[in-house]
Structure formats: C-alpha cells, structure tokens
C-alpha cells in the first residue's frame, strides 16, 4: 500500500481475513443460514469495498501524472498476471470438467480476464485498473467525477444486488456489472476525495458515532434482501459503501501506527492465496479424509495466514516473490 499509514495496513489485513470468512461460508457453510445472512450478505461486503477506497486514497494523496498512473497500472497488471498463472491449473480443470473445447476455453478465459477476473476473487484487480483510469480522466473535475461515478455505482448495485437486469446482450459481452466501471470507480473517487481533504479528517467524534448506526443499517439492508431472495449473494450494498467510507475515514484520521512492509504484503497474499488453500483443503474428501465443514473452515483460515507468512518471509530472500505481493 505505502508507508506512513499503518492504520490502513492493519485495517487491510483484518478485512482480508473477513473476506476469507466470506468465502469459507460460500465454500463450506453454504447451507448455514446464519453465516449466509450475517457474514456473507452483510459485514463481509465491506471488505473489497474498503480496498477500493484505500487504494484511491493512497494513490491520489500525492500528485498523479501519466507516469505514476502507468507505474501503478503496471504494478497491478504484474500482480494480476502472476496470480493468474497460479490459478491457471484450476481454470483448465474447470474447462475440462465443463467439456469446453480449446477455442471456447480461450475465448472464455480472455473475456473473464478483461471483464470479470480470471478467478472469482481476482475481479478486484482487473476492476481496480479500470476504476483508476476512470478517476484519473476526471480527476480535475471533482463534482462531475463524483456525480458520474455515483450514478454508475447506483446502477451497479441495483443490477448486481437488487436483481434489476440490463439487456441480455450486455451480459453476453461484459458478463457482470460487478466491475471497475459500475462499482470500483466511485469508491476510488471517494478515496481521492479523502486524500484531497485529509487535513480536515481529524474531527472523528461524529464519524465514530455514525459508524455503529451505519453497521446496523448494513445488517438491516442485507437481512431484508436475504429475506426476499434467500439465494442471493450480496457483493456490495448501499450501506456497505457507507460503512466502508466511514471506517476508512476514521482509520485515516486517527494517529497513525507504524507498520512494516511485511504487514502490508501479508494482507495482499492472504486475499489472493486463500481460494487456492480452500481448494486444497476440499481435496481431502477425494483422499478419503472426511472433515466436517467447521474443521475445513478453521484449517483454511489458519493455512491462509501461514501461507501468507511463508510467502512474505521467502520474499526477503527471493526477490522474484515480490511480484506476488
């Protein structure tokens, strides 16, 4: 992320673990109504939402020109490419399982790589690139930036969360509205605004009072959506945006603690490696080792943390591993 904002480093690692809990629920506890409503469809939705805001803040807290944007996009592309290679065997296995021929698999892979992420959690990286570009283009027109991206966010939430659909041709090409244009651009724009007004974020009393109310509202919105559509998985809701903005604002405004580069890198690795860990844990059934959902969930969380620790530790000796963080 960048030095000098230790609070955000700590927040990012906590949110990465929250996202692991979300995906654990989707993998191993999919029949658990409590987990579905009170983790997956509510509090866990602030994870990636906050990532976008923090990324926008940290990028735009300094003057941003073409060279800096190019450098940032290249860094994200490199990270995206490295982890795409890691997950490529799983993608190939899925194509073989689904019976897709080689041309069909290539088209599907390229389409997902551009519009939806090469693996289900990788959408954040591809979306972040698009969101950064959108915000950079309008960075000197703050009112237009916020108005346009807020409109896109509203459309994105209504289509992805509330089930209002675009024409079928849109999804045939772009697959989803859970992307950098409709969801990421507004959040990165908010991060830029926080960077622009950072000096005014010291009066945190009102923010601290609003946060619990916003969290309650998040559970109300998520609970109501889940009640009317029990199978829907919420990615971002209106209240998760509000909670994320307040939470990141508070963490920026508080006195900053010192955090090492290792802490920053751990959160990235936890987020990017945990689906691979869960796939490995899930293979235990095929090996005749039958574990219940709770045990699989616990092992997945611990192994994700240990794997991240190992990768970060090895990166101090092998610089090539830096490409994965």
Predicted region positions:
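Alpha-helical transmembrane segments and their immediate juxtamembrane cytosolic regions
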Residues: 1-325
């Amino acid at each position: 992320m960048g030095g000098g904002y230790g609070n955000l480093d700590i927040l990012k690692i906590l949110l990465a673990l929250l996202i692991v809990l979300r995906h654990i629920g989707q993998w191993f506890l999919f029949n658990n109504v409590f987990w579905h409503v009170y983790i997956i469809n509510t509090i866990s939705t602030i994870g990636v939402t906050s990532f976008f805001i923090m990324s926008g803040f940290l990028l735009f807290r300094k003057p941003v020109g073409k060279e800096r944007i190019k450098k940032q996009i290249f860094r994200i592309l490199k990270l995206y490419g490295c982890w795409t290679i890691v997950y490529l065997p799983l993608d190939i296995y899925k194509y073989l399982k689904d019976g897709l021929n080689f041309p069909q698999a290539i088209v599907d892979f390229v389409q997902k790589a551009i519009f939806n992420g090469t693996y289900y959690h990788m959408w954040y990286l591809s979306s972040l690139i698009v969101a950064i570009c959108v915000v950079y283009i309008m960075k000197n027109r703050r009112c237009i930036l916020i108005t346009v991206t807020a409109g896109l966010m509203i459309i994105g939430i209504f289509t992805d969360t509330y089930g209002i659909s675009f024409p079928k041709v849109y999804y045939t090409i772009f697959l989803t509205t859970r992307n950098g244009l409709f969801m990421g651009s507004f959040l990165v724009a908010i991060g830029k605004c926080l960077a622009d007004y950072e000096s005014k974020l010291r009066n945190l009393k009102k923010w601290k009072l609003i946060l619990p109310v916003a969290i309650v509202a998040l559970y109300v919105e998520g609970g109501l959506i889940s009640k009317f559509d029990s199978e829907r998985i919420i990615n971002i809701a209106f209240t998760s945006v509000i909670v994320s903005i307040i939470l990141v604002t508070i963490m920026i405004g508080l006195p900053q603690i010192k955090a090492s580069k290792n802490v920053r890198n751990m959160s990235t690795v936890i987020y990017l490696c945990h689906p691979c860990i869960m796939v490995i844990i899930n293979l235990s059934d095929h090996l005749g080792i039958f574990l219940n959902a709770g045990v699989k969930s616990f092992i997945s969380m611990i192994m994700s943390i240990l794997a991240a620790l190992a990768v970060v530790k090895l990166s101090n000796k092998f610089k090539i591993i830096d490409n994965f963080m």
